Structures are given as structure tokens and as C-alpha cells.
Amino acid sequence: MNPPVTLPPPQPTHPGVVLGIDPGLNRTGYAVLAPRGRTPILREAGVIRSTPKLALSERVREIGEGLQEVFEQYRPETVALEQVFSTGQFPQSALLMAHARGVILFIAARNLCPVIGYAPRQVKRLLTGSGKADKRQIQLAVQSELRLAQILEPNDVADAAAIALCHYHSARLPANPAERL
């Protein structure tokens, strides 16, 4: 009989470089996280702005070009994207956000990068323990998790980092409830 084989303990997996995106037609927040042990490191965070006076097609182009620059510089392995959230009160907002999401999905596909969608409540619950956390609570949770000296501003950037963190932690779980887009 052969002696028992001892297998090494399973190593936690990490999702590689994650690009978190908070889509918007006026401002699209983004955050790039890279693995570093159990806690990721923030490599870059910012806002891609479109010019409100331009035609819709030009604004979408501006978002796409800005996002392509981020892809070229950081080569993310996954995009974590906030799902569309809309109440019946503001259908126009959801429609405008859909244009930004469309170009985000296009740029990700062009760069052969999978996109995973997360509902806002899912992100809030994972980071703060409450699906009803406010913007300030999200900013503080992101600051703490990434060990930043200051909170990330504006909210679009903090939200993008929160979405990336949600993916970073969810991707390590056996049953990730996220939706591949």
C-alpha cells in the first residue's frame, strides 16, 4: 500500500487586475485594483468626463477613448460594472446611463476582457454589511479596505473602487452571485 499523499492547502485565488466602473454619461468613475496578498492595492482611480454641450455620439466617444487609455495602461483581466439601477421616477437617467454602459461593454469586448455586473445593494452589503449604506459609508469602507490616507472623491470614484472590491472578494467565493454581461 502506498503512503498517504499530503496535498498542499488550497491557495486563495485572486481575480488579477480588476477595473471597477461606475457608469455615467457625464462622469464615469473608474478604479484599477491589483492583487497584493489578501488585500488588493489601488493602482489608479479617476473620472472620465464627457462634454455636456456635445452631441450624444461624441460624448459616448469621449467615454470610450478615455476608457481605452485605461485598458492600454493597466491591462485589466476583469471589468466589474455597476448594474443599471433606476426607479420609475427617473427613466431618462437609466437611458443615459445605458449609453455609457454600451460603450463600456464595447471597449471591454474589444480588449477581450470579461465584464461582471454587480447590483448596487450587493456592493453595499459586501463592503458595509448593509445594502442600504449611504455614499459616505461607502467612501469610508473603501478607504479602510484599501488603507488609503484619504477618502476617494468624487463619489463616482469611490463607487468604482467599491465595485472593484466587491468583485475582488466575490471572485474568491465558490458561489459568486454576480452576473456575467
Model feature map: region roles:
Residues M1-L181:
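Phosphate- and other anionic-substrate recognition elements at nucleic-acid/protein interfaces
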